[in-house]
Amino acid sequence: MALLQISEPGQSPDPHQRRIAVGIDLGTTHSLVAAVRNGVAECLPDDQGRVLLPSVVRYLPQGRREIGHAAQAALSTDAGNTIASAKRFMGRTLADIDAPEKLPYRFAEQEAGRGVIGIETVDGTKTAVEVSAEILATLRFRAEDTFNDDIHGAVITVPAYFDDAQRQATKDAAKLAGINLLRLINEPTAAAIAYGLDNGSEGVYAVYDLGGGTFDISILRLSQGVFEVVSTGGDSALGGDDYDAALAEWVAQQTGVVPQTAEDKARWRMAARLCKQALTDAQVATLTAELSTGAVHFDVKRSDFDASTAHLTARSLAAVRRALKDAGLARDEVQGVVLVGGSTRMPQVREAVAEFFGRDPLINLNPDEVVALGAAIQANQLAGNSSSGDMLLLDVIPLSLGVETMGGLVERIISRNETIPTARAQDFTTYKDGQTALAVHVVQGERDLVADCRSLARFELRGIPPMAAGAARIRVTFTVDADGLLSVGAKEQTSGVEAHIHVKPSYGLSDDEVARMLQDGFATAQQDMQARALVEARVDADRMLMATESALQADGDVLAADQRAAIDALIDALRASVGSEDAAVIEAATQALAKGTESFAAERMNRSIQQALAGKSVQSLS
């Protein structure tokens, strides 16, 4: 979400020094980090070449954690302590969670009346903010390892439909992860940046973004470097996870299988996800689940999957219709449709979108990566690295903001789809004679009754001079910044008394809570570094063991008996060292095995060369 960037105040860059800035797509299912290198945005892989980081964190006793692929592997065996799709819980209350009994977690409210969701683990109660911070920190470390330097800051993407509470939770997670947040940017907007800069397209475009947990639709007008978001919509509780759940439910009805334990529920959901993914390329796939009650194998046709999830695709298209109506556009006025999010790989989704708009969607860029790439381009600009200042991005606010008036009604101050950053003011007056205070209740939503909208904050303006009802003039000003976050001020015009509040959602984290988490992070920084080194050492050891054992299986016959015995002894020593809590011990054993197999590697190379040259004449090689 950025206006024309010349340079940020206080950030005039040294023209000879490039700041490292990254874009982060904090996704429900997977997360990515990208950066601009040599003028091109690219996603940064981990040390094994993997770009996608599963958005999964496993909590273990004594403060230990597994993040990403290692945690994902434990989803079916330690479901209660392995938290996935935490993005769906960001800024939410327990009442907001749909069917919590179907999830393998033990939920608890952290603080009565504030509603912060906690998930109980063997390492204590964790919030979605803490889980997201672990993922963000992992991506930050990946970027710093790639560049061998600290990063200046990051642009983090959020769904366009995220409300103030969810955006604030994302900012809290970034702070907890030690990331200098340059800006929050809407995911569809990031996709528009990537496509607009890569393809130079102009006209009206729809960005259809179906991720793991959220759906967004944005209608954009692109013209000569200006990106104007003319309307947004979506569903913050619709994504690939829901397709998994619908398929799992349908198969359960067909087979009569009802998973009971948390582990069985997780295995069942994972089996449904794998089956869904297989149906992207196949007409029939087998859902296979190893449950505590026995193994389940059930063939699913793509047509069955499409039928059992058609209502979800229809929900997304209903949001598309609303967004087009808000923009005052007919579907045939849309020149192109951009698909974003891994869930758009489903054939039924692509077919439904193509049929709705009467044209095939654009799939030039990897739908998993396009959001991170756009965020990286924006981060590069905000860091002052980009010499091109010809991109103007006009974003909009997704939900109306207003205040409660007498009778529990909502008076809108800023309407949805208004371009941001923005500020709007409206005058109010007192209700009673001699009234010296005014309560301001800030709400968000499209309904006319306060009870049907989301409460954001409450504050009071005191010190109003006593006067007749209706005589006082109180100006209430709403200001929404470039991140879509709100501050509210109220000022009595005659006396000048005023009050301000930066809206902190009633179920967000307080600054004290964030500070406490940061302090905990500082206190365990050394321990975390040691834990990271230990994990890396064990990974390297496992990799060396697998490579050596594979080589022995293939070419072990080239070794003499005493050579084989020496290598076997080194393997046993390394395998024994993996159980150590000392990274140096494991590293020493790994290096010893590497050194001890050098002559074996040379023998294997000689054999390969001899086999390659067997039967060849000198003339045939010249």
From Swiss-Prot:
A matching Pfam family: HSP70
GO BP annotations listed: iron-sulfur cluster assembly
The keyword Chaperone belongs to this UniProt entry's keyword annotation: yes
GO molecular function: ATP binding; ATP hydrolysis activity; ATP-dependent protein folding chaperone; unfolded protein binding
Superkingdom: Bacteria
Keywords per UniProt: ATP-binding, Chaperone, Nucleotide-binding
UniProt entry tagged with the keyword Thylakoid: no
Family per similarity comment: Belongs to the heat shock protein 70 family.
Cited function: Chaperone involved in the maturation of iron-sulfur cluster-containing proteins. Has a low intrinsic ATPase activity which is markedly stimulated by HscB.
Name by which UniProt lists this protein: Chaperone protein HscA homolog
Organism of provenance: Delftia acidovorans (strain DSM 14801 / SPH-1)
Organism taxonomic ancestry: Bacteria, Pseudomonadati, Pseudomonadota, Betaproteobacteria, Burkholderiales
